[in-house]
Amino acid sequence: MIDAKQLNSLALAYMGDAVYEQYIRYHLLQKGKVRPNQLHRLGTSFVSAKAQAKVVYHLLETAFLTEEEEAVLRRGRNANSGTVPKNTDVQTYRHSTAFEALIGYHHLLNNRERLDEIVYKAIAVLEEQEGGTSS
């Protein structure tokens, strides 16, 4: 069994990236989005570093997270990947990594209910800020 509480933040983010991507793909298909180009464009609007950073800011501003979750975010944000982000600034990239670490953390702890709450909140925040994805 993997001890998510001791796992490297970048490893948590690695898992979280895959888990979050799966949630988003399911969400888009559930909304009836089936054309490949549309799926890619809409998917990117949820999984980009910029989008994930927006979610982190919202979760922190609204006190949505527990102290433990905020600690996971801090660990993820402070992790040094050694890579330079291509399409965003370092701060946005670090917040994105923090969000993915939080998703990976809950996934590996099998906290399905809380994972669902966080992901569905993220989707709601991004759809509201972008005017929805019903187009």
Swiss-Prot record:
GO process terms (BP): rRNA processing
CC terms in the record's Gene Ontology section: cytoplasm
UniProt-listed InterPro entries: Mini3_fam (IPR008226), RNase_III_dom (IPR000999), RNase_III_sf (IPR036389)
Keywords from the UniProt entry: Cytoplasm, Endonuclease, Hydrolase, Magnesium, Nuclease, Ribosome biogenesis, RNA-binding, rRNA processing, rRNA-binding
Role of this protein: Involved in correct processing of both the 5' and 3' ends of 23S rRNA precursor. Processes 30S rRNA precursor transcript even in absence of ribonuclease 3 (Rnc); Rnc processes 30S rRNA into smaller rRNA precursors.
Enzyme Commission code: 3.1.26.-
Name of the protein: Mini-ribonuclease 3
RNA-binding among keywords: yes
Main location, first listed in the record: cytoplasm
PANTHER family, A to Z: MINI-RIBONUCLEASE 3
Subunit structure: Homodimer.
Cofactor(s) the protein requires to work: Mg(2+)
Gene Ontology molecular function: ribonuclease III activity; rRNA binding
Family: Belongs to the MrnC RNase family.
Active site: D17
Pfam families xrefs: Ribonuclease_3
